[in-house]
């Protein structure tokens, strides 16, 4: 049955996105079988719950296609590891430390503005947010290390700081260190140069929580990886929390040593995906309130509907509008936003049409536009049709009746139902959300 599971994984890899497969399916291991039950093992409760909720029917279908319809699946949780990393010999330890990193008399390098209260949680980052909160509430508990990955400007750095700030709010004496991997490497180089490796070791290995941002930058740097490896081992053995972020899944970081890659996979791996329009609006609202900027609803939607998924860029647009409003004494309006941000945002509502969306979606699903306009209720047509209708409402100024007219004369209530159906699925179905995001980006590019 192990061969069946490996083949089922291979089949699932062909239909799921690379990121989804790596996050949810690849970590599932074969345990054994009894009668017609396939026993599988999830690395932790988080993964088990999410797979059971979103992917178990798909997994079961894949397995049954290779066996028979009577095969069942039992998804268990891996037992906690009792093995700990081997303590490196004194001759191997070459870590260094110039100044202490935390405690009442030293800087943690944390940004006090980045807290869980200021983090906007949506479907795209809910898992990573929950994982970060769990670590902050119980450091070195179930999820050690915690590895958070995702694209630029999606909130990884915010969550790292939020973990540190929360722990400090509970325990001011906690020794916490937030470093970028580049700063870690530069400090290592300086300590090697001035022969202060003992200080380097004492600094990082006495931490209660080590937070490293953008770990991918140490890939290919042999000495830095070696020092981080020993630091990781020392902290892990001392039951201290380690949290790192990256723009890629551990296995996808070129030049990263296998021993580090395997250690990152000991704990929990959580991804952050691009925010949807609703989450971007919520982010803008929170930022506007914090900066005392009066932001009309139509302007918030205009900014959120831009092609950028980078939260920092999104907030930068808001700050720019706020500055213009403050300096000119004028209220922010949609016309002002279009004028001030014309070099950044192309107003998609002026360029994208219902016909363009229909053609683009039909090509993506290998369908004909006529299929999307038809009344056929085949599942292979219903979902693409609903997605196309949702995108028409999202990316054009067309009203519900106008969209219905272009989809074969459908009633506006049918169009409203399709939009609401997709909106609901976006928060529940990772694959559908990825598909919608891919289509949206393609239409805006």
From Swiss-Prot:
The gene is dnaA. Oligomerizes as a right-handed, spiral filament on DNA at oriC. Pfam families: Bac_DnaA (PF00308), Bac_DnaA_C (PF08299), DnaA_N (PF11638). Domain I is involved in oligomerization and binding regulators, domain II is flexibile and of varying length in different bacteria, domain III forms the AAA+ region, while domain IV binds dsDNA. Residues 1-71 are annotated as: Domain I, interacts with DnaA modulators. It comes from Geobacter sulfurreducens (strain ATCC 51573 / DSM 12127 / PCA). One of its GO terms (cellular component) is cytoplasm. ATP binds at residues 153, 155-157. Residues 83-106 are annotated as: Disordered. This is Chromosomal replication initiator protein DnaA.
């Amino acid at each position: 049955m192990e061969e069946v599971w490996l083949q089922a994984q291979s089949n699932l890899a062909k239909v799921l996105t690379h990121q989804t497969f790596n996050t949810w399916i690849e970590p599932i291991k074969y345990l054994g079988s009894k009668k017609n039950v396939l026993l599988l093992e999830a690395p932790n409760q988080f993964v088990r719950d999410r797979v059971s909720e979103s992917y178990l029917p798909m997994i079961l279908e894949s397995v049954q296609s290779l066996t028979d319809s009577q095969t069942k699946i039992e998804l268990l949780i891996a037992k906690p590891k009792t093995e700990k990393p081997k303590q490196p010999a004194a001759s191997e330890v070459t870590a260094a430390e110039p100044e202490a990193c935390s405690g009442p008399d030293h800087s943690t390098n944390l940004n006090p503005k980045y807290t869980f209260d200021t983090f906007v949680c949506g479907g795209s980052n809910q898992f990573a947010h929950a994982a970060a909160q769990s670590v902050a509430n119980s450091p070195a508990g179930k999820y050690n290390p915690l590895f958070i990955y995702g694209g630029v400007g999606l909130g990884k750095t915010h969550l790292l700081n939020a973990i540190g700030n929360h722990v400090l709010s509970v325990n001011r004496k906690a020794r916490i260190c937030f470093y970028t991997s580049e700063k870690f490497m530069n400090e290592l180089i300086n300590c090697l140069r001035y022969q202060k490796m003992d200080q380097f070791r004492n600094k990082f290995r006495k931490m209660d929580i080590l937070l490293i941002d953008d770990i991918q930058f140490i890939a290919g740097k042999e000495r830095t990886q070696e020092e981080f490896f020993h630091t990781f081992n020392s902290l892990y053995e001392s039951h201290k929390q380690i949290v790192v972020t990256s723009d890629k899944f551990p296995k996808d970081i070129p030049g990263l040593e296998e021993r580090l890659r395997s250690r990152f996979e000991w704990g929990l791996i959580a991804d952050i995906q691009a925010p949807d329009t609703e989450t971007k609006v919520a982010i803008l609202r929170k930022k506007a309130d914090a900066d005392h900027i009066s932001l009309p609803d139509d302007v918030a939607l205009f900014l959120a509907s831009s092609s950028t998924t980078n939260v920092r860029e999104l907030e930068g647009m808001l700050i720019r509008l706020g500055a213009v409003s403050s300096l000119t004494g004028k209220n922010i309006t949609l016309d002002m936003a279009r004028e001030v941000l014309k070099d950044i945002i192309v107003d998609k509502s002026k360029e994208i049409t219902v016909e363009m969306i229909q053609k683009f979606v039909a090509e993506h699903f290998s369908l004909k536009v006529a299929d999307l306009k038809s009344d056929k209720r085949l599942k292979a047509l219903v979902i693409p049709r609903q997605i196309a209708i949702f995108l028409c409402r999202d990316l054009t100024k067309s009203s519900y009746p106008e969209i219905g007219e272009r989809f074969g004369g459908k009633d506006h209530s049918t169009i409203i139902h399709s939009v609401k159906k997709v909106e609901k699925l976006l928060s529940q179905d990772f694959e559908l959300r990825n598909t919608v995001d891919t289509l949206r980006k393609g239409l805006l590019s």
